[in-house]
Amino acid sequence: MSRYLLEIGVEEIPSDYIEATKSQLKDKFKKLIDDNKLTVDEIRVESTPRRFVVFLENINASESDELISIKGPSVAIAYDENGNPNKPLLGFLRGQRAELSDVVVKDFKGSDYIFIEKKEESKSVKEVLRENVYDLVKSISFNRSMRWGARSIRWARPIRYFLSILDDKVLDFDAEGISVGNITKGHRSLGSDHIEISTIDEYEDKLRENYVILSSKERRDLIIRGLNKVNMEKGGEFMKDEDLLREVVNIVEYPTVLAGDIDEKYLELPKEVIITPMKDHQRYFPVLDEKTGNLLPYFLLVRNGDDNHSENVISGNKKVLVARLEDAKFFYDIDSSRPLESHVEELKNLTFFEGLGNMYQKTQRLMDLTAKYQQQLNLGEDIKEDLKRAAYLSKADLVTKMVIEFTELEGTMGRIYAKESNESDRVATAIEEQYLPNSAGAALPKSITGIVLSIADKIDSIVGLYAKERYVTGSQDPFALRRRALGFINIILKNNIDAVSYTH
C-alpha cells in the first residue's frame, strides 16, 4: 500500500473558484484510479487560497494482469475458400504482433469474428501517477482561466510549483518547466517560502509551523470560535451568513478574529445600508443585539495572520469602513431628499438592453403585464392600483445615488425609499420582492403584489433577451436567464399558478 501527496502551489485564487476546483480534483483522481484498475482507501482534497492538496491514502495497483480481447475482421472475410488467411486477417495479426495460433473466434452481434486475447500488464502506482497527474491538473476547468509563459496549460491563476511525494520520495513528472519536488511555501508574510518536506506525515505540521492551517474545516471552526468569543465580550451575536463565512474561510490561511467599533451615528442609517458595505465590500461580520436584533456599533473581521499589531490592523480596517459608511450616508441623504417617484423619468436615460428600450419603457411593459395577470389570476380589485403603482416605481431606485454605488441594494433601497415616500406596504414590498429569488434556494416573494411583479419582470426579461438571441449556452449565462427562469418556475409551483402569458 502506498501514500501519495500532491500540492498544487498557485498564486492567490478567487474564493468562489475553490470549492468547485476541489470537487473536480477529487472526481478526476477517482476516475484515474478506476480507469487504471488501482484501489484507494481515501481521496482527501484540501485547499487554501494559495494551494490545492490531494492525499491518496493506501493506493495500490492491481495484483493480477488483465486479459483483454481485441476484435479483428469477421470470419467471413478472414479466410479464403481453402481456409487460408486473407489479407484482412494477416494485417490484423501483424498489427497485433500475433500468430495464427493466437486466433480465437467469438460471436459478435450475431456473426463470428476474429479475436486476439492478450494479457495487459497492470501499471504500477508510480507509473500511473507519473504519466497522468499533470494532464489531470490541466483538465480542471474554470469559468475564466489564463495562460502564463509558453505553456499549454490554462488555469484560474498561474501554478508556481508542484509538491509531489509518493511513499516519502519525490515523484517527478513533466510539468512544462514548472518545478516538481518536495518544497512547499508557508504563509505569504509570516512563513518561510522554502519548506522542505521529507515525509508525508510531517507535511501538515510543517505548514502549521509556518502559519498555514490546511484544513478548511479547521479554519472554519477557528473562525466561528473567534466570532463567538468576541461576541461574548461585546454582548451581541454575529450575523449568521453562510456565504460570507465560506468566502472568508477560503481567503485566509491562518485566521484570527478581531473586533472594531464604529460611531453610533451610522446606526441611524437603514440597517441594509450599513450591512452591505460591511459584508459585501469588506467581508466583515456585523454584530446584532441578541434581544432586539438591532445592529450594534461593532464589526468583526477575520485577519489572515496572527494577532500581532492587531490595533493597527483594526484601525486600518475601521478607516476603510468609515469611508464607505460616509459615502453611504452622503448618498442616502441625497436620495432621501426626493420622493422615489421623481426618479422615474430618469429611467429614460438608462438602457435596459439594446433593441429592448430603456428602463422607463420596461416599467411600462410591467404595468401592462401586471394588469393582465391581475385579471388572469382573478385577483381582487383592491390590489389593482397597488400593482400598477409598484410596476411604475419598480426600477426607480436604479438611478439613485445609493444603488449606483451599491448595486447589491437594488430593490432593497426601492422599498426603503418607497416607505419614506409614503407609498403603501404592498407597493414597497413588491419593489423589493420583484428580484426574488436572487440565487438558488433563496427566499421567494411572499406578498401577492411581489409575486405578480416578480413573474412579470422575469417573463419580460426572458422573452426580450431570447428575442435578441441572448441564449444560455452551457456554463455561460451572462444575463442570468437560467436563474430568472428557475425563479419563475419556483414561484409558479409554490403558489399553484396555472398559467400566465406574455403578449401586448
Which sequence ranges carry the predicted segments?
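Amphipathic alpha-helical "coupling" segments that flank catalytic cores
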Residues: 1-502
